[in-house]
Amino acid sequence: GFDLGMNTAGGFGEYIRIPSEWAVAKPNGLTLRESMIIGTAGFTAGLSVQGLVEHGVTPDKGDILVTGATGGVGSVAVALLAKAGFSVVACTGKKEHESFLKTLGASKVITRDELLENKERPMLKEQFAGAVDTVGGEYLAQAIKATQYGGAVTCCGLTAAADLNVSVFPFILRGVSL
């Protein structure tokens, strides 16, 4: 996390001195070993799901979209959401992994091309109560445009692009939170 190994030496050290605000408390329900197994991808997925819940997204509100669903963060997000009772729509560029995503708990699998349909439109039909975006760019924009009134989108990736080109309509007209 933060800039360990990039701008702060010691990323591979057994011990390192860091500012206290960089430290994250170990969850009470996990052992040290379990918390390390989860790793960065699991931690990021957990924070993304927590973000949806903190914005009032609940299983009864509708489907949750997860982009980049076969990746590390995406696959853990699919599993966490399904375990929490959400109906998950997994978006992937690897349609051959549909059975893997269904095993994790996805109720539906869509392709990237399906998600990008009508991308020129400023808003799309309300399809999702929320989304976990691990890809960024036009995929994040489409997730925002397809989120229903009062929904939320969490974003944590930028493999497609770091920029976001979307109108303010979903935020103003639907109260979507990002």
Specify the residue positions occupied by each region the protein language model found.
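C-terminal boundary of histidine-terminating zinc-finger modules
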Residues: 33
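Glycine-rich phosphate/adenylate-binding loop and adjacent beta-alpha elements
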Residues: 1-25
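Short amphipathic alpha-helix with an adjacent loop that forms part of the alpha/beta core around
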Residues: 115-126
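Glycine-rich phosphate-binding loop and adjacent beta-alpha segment
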Residues: 3, 7, 138-178
